[in-house]
Amino acid sequence: MKWKKLSLETTTEAVDLVCDMLLSLGIEGIEVVDKVPITEEEKKRMFIDILPELGEDDGIATINFYLENEEDLPSLKVSIQEGLDELRDFVEVGSGKLSLSETEDKDWINNWKEFFKPFRVDDTIVIKPTWEKLEERKETDLVIEIDPGTAFGTGAHETTKLCILNIKKYMQPGATLLDVGCGSGILTIIGRKLGAKTAVAIDIDENAVSASKENCDVNQLEAVLCQSSDSSTRTEGRIELFDGNVIEDRGLRERIGLNSYDFVVANILADIIIPLSAVVGEFMKPGAYFISSGIIDMKAEEVKEAILRNGFIIEEITTMGDWTSIVAKKPNK
C-alpha cells in the first residue's frame, strides 16, 4: 500500500502550536525536522556517542505526516490553511507551504532481518538468527540463536564481538556473571554457555529485558523475569533478568547483590560506562573482572581514566574498527 506524505513548512517558533493544530484535526504520527541545537538533556536521552550534524539553525521546521486515504486531502488542506491563518494572529508561522509526496508501506520494524545472517565470531562461536537455517556446523561449534527484536545485540557489531572474545578469554567456568545493559541478552547467554554458574542481567529498557528472556528460552536456558523490588537469589544454572538503573538506584544494586560477582560485562556507551565505573566495583568480588565495551575510539582515553580513577587495574585494551573494549580487574585485598 502507498501512503501520501505531507510536509508542512513552518518556523521553529511556531512548530509546537502548529503540531497542536494538526493533532486537533485528527492527524497523528507527526515528525518534526529542524536544525535546532540538541540540548545536554536531549543528548542523554538519545544514548549515542556521535551526534548528527544539523548545520546552522535557520529557524525553519518541517512537519511530516501521512495519509492513507487521498480522498480526505482537499478538505484537510483547507482546514490546515484555516488553522495557520488563526495562528498568524499570535505567532510567525512562516510560509505554511504544504507539499505532497508518496511513500511505500513497509515493515520497518522487521525489514532489517533480511540482512542478518548466521556468522562466526571466531572458530567455535556461531551466531544464528532464529529465523535462519545453519547450513554448515562443526561438532565443536557453540551456536547461539538470537532474535534481538528492537533491542541492541545481534553479535555482529564490533563492540559485541569484542565482549564475546573477552568473555571467552577471561571468564572461568563456574563464575558468577553480571551483564549490565543486557540488550538482547546475547552476552548473558554466551556467558552461561561458556560455563558461568549463575548469571544476572539488567537493562534500563523493559523491552530489552523481555527480548533477553525470549532469547534465553530459545537457547534452552532457564531464565526468570524479576521485579526491581526483588532480591537476586543467584540460583545455580538460572538467569535472573531485571530492569532498572543500577547507576542511580543504590537499593537495586543491593538487591542484585554486592560483592557477589566474578565477572561483570557492560556493552553500552562511553558516557554510561564512565559513571558506571564508580559503582560497578560494589558488585564485584576481589580479583573480579570488569569488561566494558561500546566505547568509540575518541572516548577511549576518557573511559580508561575513569576506570583507573575508581581503583581498577587495566589488564588489556582491545580494538576493532572504531571501537574499544577495556578489560579491568578489581584488586585483591
UniProtKB/Swiss-Prot annotation:
GO cellular component terms, semicolon-separated: cytoplasm
EC number: 2.1.1.-
Disulfide-linked positions: none
Binding site for S-adenosyl-L-methionine: 160, 181, 203, 267
Predominant localisation class: cytoplasm
Localization annotation: Cytoplasm
Catalyzed reaction equations: L-lysyl-[protein] + 3 S-adenosyl-L-methionine = N(6),N(6),N(6)-trimethyl-L-lysyl-[protein] + 3 S-adenosyl-L-homocysteine + 3 H(+)
Any one GO BP annotation for this protein: methylation
Domain of life, per lineage: Bacteria
Molecular function (Gene Ontology), one example: protein-lysine N-methyltransferase activity
Coiled-coil residues: none
Enzyme class, broadest EC rank: transferase
Keywords recorded for this protein, A-Z: Cytoplasm, Methyltransferase, S-adenosyl-L-methionine, Transferase
Record flagged with keyword 4Fe-4S: no
Record flagged with keyword Electron transport: no
Family assignment from sequence similarity: Belongs to the methyltransferase superfamily. PrmA family.
Function description: Methylates ribosomal protein L11.
PANTHER family found in the cross-reference section: ELECTRON TRANSFER FLAVOPROTEIN BETA SUBUNIT LYSINE METHYLTRANSFERASE
Protein's recorded name: Ribosomal protein L11 methyltransferase
Species this chain originates from: Lachnoclostridium phytofermentans (strain ATCC 700394 / DSM 18823 / ISDg) (Clostridium phytofermentans)
Gene: prmA
